[in-house]
């Protein structure tokens, strides 16, 4: 496996020749110098017309310089070399390099590039250009290092960082990455085709892919920018980066400072954001704040000043202003870590003292210092009140914000590269979250039984649950499980009429052998734990196993998700419905669909009521500043619109209608089958 651009800059079929005496004379007359003219080779068709004030040393290969380069503002410049010193360089056709205060050394530069006012650009010694750099995620003192490389995915990073209980696996994966990186080792860096670099400080030991634009960066040291024509990378003013890899489609600008970082596809870092020892995967956004030793899965977003993400694993996170965590208890150093599972939010000024583990799709409000573990209670509120951490199980299931997040994530996938590195499952309800709800129902019922139904509060994993919150949590989780199970059954039974009961059961028969048991979230990829365990054994027991095979495994799991999900649903049916899929009658399924419809409508009604709060009288405070009550209401409606015409509200209403119709259609087909039995 090789970096995609390193060997694509120059046409191997091009014939190169030495300069003739007349060309040397003309170049000398144009204020050019060479340490040894015989070491300069040029392409057929080369002319000296567009080269002036250039100095050459070492082995030099030049293309032809005959086309105009169109610059922003409509300015045209002829390709060529002006006021530059080149040492051991290859320059492709129709590239313009000018006004280089120091020099360019040991670089292969592609065609159609524009390099202007770059202080210094060189390759020093042999380099792997950021590949195989160890990044100390989660534990600042080490122990979970992930070696980065050009094609690192969120899924592979998760396994390397989190599966330290399998040292044989860790060492095997590290060896593969080390071998991959060794194959890239070179004493010459490469710049792809159509690259634009201006007004930049020092670039040292950095490979840059096609169509990259670097404008005003301060210093880039030991890295790779995996830009390509489909998904160019932009690096803007005052960026300082060392020991890094930046993936396709990324945007890094406005004073970003980073060290030992991997920046995933379509990530956006700007506005003085700083990061060290951190991995950011697809569509992450970081502005104004700081990240230290984090494993940031897809869609981790921190946009505000005074926000610090440290020593944690996150994905689909929305961090509020002033959110931070502590990994240091001033005893043995910054050795603690935390996990915030997918889809969570932190409110302004929230704080968590690590270690802690927060359940999926949770809302974190206030300060939490007692190390809560709420991973068994997804979709919950974790709220500080009177120095205690209160847990409200399932409350986020009825939050309009949760549903909006699920809708916007796919729309905000900015990856343009056809070769996507990360596998991302956007589903809110999945075997991963539903299994936790099933466990949550049992846990809450167990708390009620153990402590008594009349208890005002219950203790759970360093949190407090109020009595009414416990009851509501059981109800919300039950509705969500009915919704998910019904969704899966209805989807499975789509299509025409059923010939007979055997035909019904044939359609319900699982088609994938994987899916039973526990499911896990590999930073975006939702997958059965058994499948990962099987692949781990394959990795450690197969001498010729490659990184390409890990990529193929993750893609295969992603592709098979819905088939494996159905296997899981069938496995859960006896526990939830009291029957296997083979024992279900048409009447049973009709009852399931009716219960599903009731659950969907009930949850949608809650979302509807939650959305209505945004149109309450309280929400109108600040509108109609200088007017009457009527003017206030009119001002509000002009800005926010009316409740019934709100896009989300209309979506909820239509969702109720569509789901009801979908359920009724299946019920009619099942009734037809029942009448024929």
What positions do the PLM features span?
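Glycine-rich hexapeptide-repeat left-handed beta-helix
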Residues: 12, 29-34, 42-65, 69-81, ...
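Long, structured ligand/cofactor-binding scaffold of large enzymes
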Residues: 83, 88-91, 183, 200
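Membrane-permeabilization and membrane-interfacing ectodomains
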Residues: 178-186
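Long, charge-dense tracts
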Residues: 102-103, 107-114, 119-129, 133-135, ...
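Short, positively charged and aromatic/hydrophobic N-terminal segments
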Residues: 3-12
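Long, compositionally biased intrinsically disordered regions
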Residues: 117, 385-677
């Amino acid at each position: 496996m090789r970096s995609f651009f390193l060997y694509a800059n120059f046409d191997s079929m091009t014939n190169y020749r030495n300069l003739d005496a007349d060309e040397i004379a003309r170049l000398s007359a144009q204020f050019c110098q060479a340490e040894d003219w015989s070491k300069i080779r040029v392409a057929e068709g080369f002319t000296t017309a567009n080269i002036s004030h250039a100095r050459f040393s070492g082995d030099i290969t030049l293309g032809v310089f005959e086309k105009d380069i169109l610059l922003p503002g409509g300015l045209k410049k002829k390709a060529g070399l002006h006021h530059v010193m080149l040492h051991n360089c290859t320059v492709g056709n129709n590239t313009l390099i000018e006004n280089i205060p120091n020099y360019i050394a040991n670089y292969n530069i592609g065609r159609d590039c524009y390099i202007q006012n770059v202080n210094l650009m060189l390759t020093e010694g042999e380099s792997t250009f950021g590949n195989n750099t160890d990044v100390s995620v989660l534990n600042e003192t080490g122990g979970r290092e992930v070696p980065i490389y050009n094609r690192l995915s969120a899924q592979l990073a998760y396994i390397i960082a989190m599966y330290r209980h399998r040292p044989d696996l860790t060492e095997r994966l590290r060896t593969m990455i080390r071998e991959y990186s060794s194959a890239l080792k070179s004493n010459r860096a490469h710049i792809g085709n159509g690259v634009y670099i201006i007004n930049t400080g020092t670039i040292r030991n950095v490979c840059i892919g096609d169509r990259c634009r670097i404008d005003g960066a301060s210093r880039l040291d030991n890295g790779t920018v995996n830009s390509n024509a489909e998904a160019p990378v932009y690096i803007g003013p005052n960026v300082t980066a060392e020991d890094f890899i930046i993936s396709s489609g990324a945007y890094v600008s406005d004073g970003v400072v980073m060290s030992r970082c991997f920046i995933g596809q379509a990530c956006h870092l700007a506005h003085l954001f700083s990061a060290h020892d951190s991995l950011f995967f697809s569509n992450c956004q970081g502005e104004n704040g700081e990240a230290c030793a984090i494993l940031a899965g897809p869609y981790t977003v921190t946009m505000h000043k005074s926000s610090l993400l440290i020593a944690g694993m996150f994905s689909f996170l929305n961090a509020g202003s002033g959110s931070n965590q502590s990994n240091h208890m001033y005893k043995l150093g910054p050795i603690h870590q935390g996990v915030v599972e997918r889809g969570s939010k932190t409110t302004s000024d929230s704080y968590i003292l690590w270690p802690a583990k927060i359940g999926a799709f949770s809302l974190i409000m206030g300060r939490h210092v007692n190390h809560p573990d709420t991973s068994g209670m997804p979709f919950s509120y974790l709220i500080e009140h009177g120095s205690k951490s209160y847990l409200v199980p399932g409350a986020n299931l009825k939050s309009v914000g949760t549903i909006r997040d699920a809708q916007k994530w796919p729309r905000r996938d900015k990856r343009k590269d056809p070769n996507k590195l990360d596998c991302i499952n956007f589903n809110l309800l999945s075997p991963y979250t539903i299994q936790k709800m099933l466990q949550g129902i049992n846990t809450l019922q167990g708390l009620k039984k153990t402590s008594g139904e009349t208890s005002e509060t219950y203790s759970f994993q360093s949190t407090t649950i109020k009595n009414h919150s416990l009851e509501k949590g059981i109800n919300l989780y039950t509705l969500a499980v009915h919704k998910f199970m019904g969704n899966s059954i209805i989807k499975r039974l789509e299509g025409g009429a059923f010939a007979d009961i055997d035909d019904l059961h044939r359609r319900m028969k699982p088609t994938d052998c994987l899916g039973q048991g526990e499911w896990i979230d590999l930073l975006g990829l939702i997958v059965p734990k058994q499948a990962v365990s099987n692949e781990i054994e394959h990795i450690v027991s197969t001498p010729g196993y490659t990184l390409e095979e890990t990529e193929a495994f993750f893609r295969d799991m992603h592709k098979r998700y819905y088939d494996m999900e159905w296997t899981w649903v069938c496995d859960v049916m006896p526990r939830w419905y009291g029957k296997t899929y083979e024992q279900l009658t048409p009447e049973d399924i009709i009852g399931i669909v009716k219960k599903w419809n009731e659950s969907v409508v009930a949850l949608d009604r809650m979302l509807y009521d939650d959305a209505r709060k945004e149109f309450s009288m309280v929400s109108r405070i600040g509108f109609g500043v200088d007017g009457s009550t009527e003017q206030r209401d009119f001002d509000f409606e002009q800005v926010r619109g009316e409740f019934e015409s709100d896009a989300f509200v209309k979506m909820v209403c239509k969702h109720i209608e569509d789901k009801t119709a979908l359920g009724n259609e299946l019920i009619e087909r099942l009734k037809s089958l029942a009448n024929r039995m």
